[in-house]
Amino acid sequence: MVERKRWSEEFSEWFNEVIEEAGILDKRYPVKGMNVWLPYGLKIMRNIEKFIHEEMERTGHQEVLFPALIPETEFKKEAEHIAGFEGEVFWVTHAGHEPLDVRLVLRPTSETAMYSMFALWIRSHADLPFKVYQIVNVYRYETKHTRPLIRVREISRFFEAHTAHADFEDAERQIKEDLEIFDNLMRKLALAYIISKRPEWDKFPGAFYSLGAEVVMPDGRTLQIGTMHNYKQNFSKAYNILYEKEDGTHDYVHQTTFGMSERLLAAVIAIHGDDRGMVLPPTIAPIQVVIVPIPKKGSEEEVYSYAKGIEEELRDAGIRVYLDLRDKRPGWKFYDWELKGVPVRVEVGPIDVQNSTVVLARRDKLEKITVKREELVDKVRELFEDIMEFLYERANEWLESHIKRVDTLEEAKAVFEDRRGIVEIPWCGEESCGLKMEEELEAKMLGIPYPEEKAKAPEGSKCPVCGREAKFIARFARTY
């Protein structure tokens, strides 16, 4: 029986325990907000990144790797950007005993590192569109309560794609492609999400507009797990990124970025988990099938040999498998692998050896079936598909049941008191009314639904602050 009581009621404690006990990260490193990746956690993250690399390859992005240090002179070129980040950067002021002539910034994100180089690389319309990406460590001095994978001072698996285009239309096409890449990745992770266009006061520093992707966590707060930004020519003018057009004239490029991080793993752990621990999608599980032999006295040899044969068969079929021969009781092993979220467990005992059968236990529903040995590989593959489908449907149901449309601030407050989630409310579009609603609801405006056709307020609806005709539906949530 799947229980999710602790998972939702004591999410914070549950999450910290799972991260630690399942071997994802060790947060005891002596710098607050900087954590050590442990082998199991890093393997899961690398499996997620494998899909990111595949999508980048498919869409013609080239991988690059930039230095982590940015000269203050470059960092300060785009005024809005520096204003947005200055309060949370780490400065390098000395080399040995000597103060540096030009201070260096540990990158909080890489626009200011990359764009002086883009100005050297991009020359003509033939160089466009120009599409690169990297996965690197970035540093932000978070003053809020730090939390592993969610709010950290060293984001160590930061994915950022940067593109340059001849015109605004092509940059818009890129944003659509980013959304498609993101959706493909979410399918691989069995996650359901929403996309919102951020309000003017909360867009990325230096952007023309920003889109954010959110999931709803077990405690009803939202977690931003992806962002896409259209910069128009804001950065290319600051960094002088010009290209020669076909008619021989010059113009500034249009730019976009797309970012994700280890918050993807935080979302997977949180949204699919239950009171026993993680439930990993088979797509990214380092171990997709674990075999636990359960011998009776005197049958050890035949049970172990049978289990070994199963391990070889699954491995030959391209399935990531592990045979658990540790000197521990089966019950202890079940507990351990359930905590680690292994999608399928194979149990074999003397009766299975006699009948040429195996018992398959699925982690998502905690159900068991007995199958014939010769059907094993097909059944396991079938289970993987079933698990992916079930996880996605459950995640989608969770998301949809936590989005509530209301008309007044009173109704919105009641939703937040009751169970949090996302509240959609009519809004006139004025910043002052949006900020007033944030204050009244003690929540953040995520923005308006995207694409914008979905964002129009129903006819006759009124902004709850000023009483004027509402133009948009605005989304509010308590966020991480």
Curated annotation (Swiss-Prot):
GO terms for biological process: prolyl-tRNA aminoacylation. It catalyses: tRNA(Pro) + L-proline + ATP = L-prolyl-tRNA(Pro) + AMP + diphosphate. Keywords: Aminoacyl-tRNA synthetase, ATP-binding, Cytoplasm, Ligase, Nucleotide-binding, Protein biosynthesis. Gene3D superfamilies: Anticodon-binding domain (3.40.50.800), Bira Bifunctional Protein, Domain 2 (3.30.930.10), C-terminal domain of ProRS (3.30.110.30). Its EC number is 6.1.1.15. PROSITE patterns: AA_TRNA_LIGASE_II. Its main location: cytoplasm. GO terms for molecular function: ATP binding; proline-tRNA ligase activity. It is an enzyme of class 6 (ligase). SMART domains: ProRS-C_1. It is found in: Cytoplasm. Homodimer. Catalyzes the attachment of proline to tRNA(Pro) in a two-step reaction: proline is first activated by ATP to form Pro-AMP and then transferred to the acceptor end of tRNA(Pro). Belongs to the class-II aminoacyl-tRNA synthetase family. ProS type 3 subfamily. Consists of three domains: the N-terminal catalytic domain, the anticodon-binding domain and the C-terminal extension. NCBIfam families: proS_fam_I. This is Proline--tRNA ligase. It comes from Pyrococcus horikoshii (strain ATCC 700860 / DSM 12428 / JCM 9974 / NBRC 100139 / OT-3). The gene is proS.
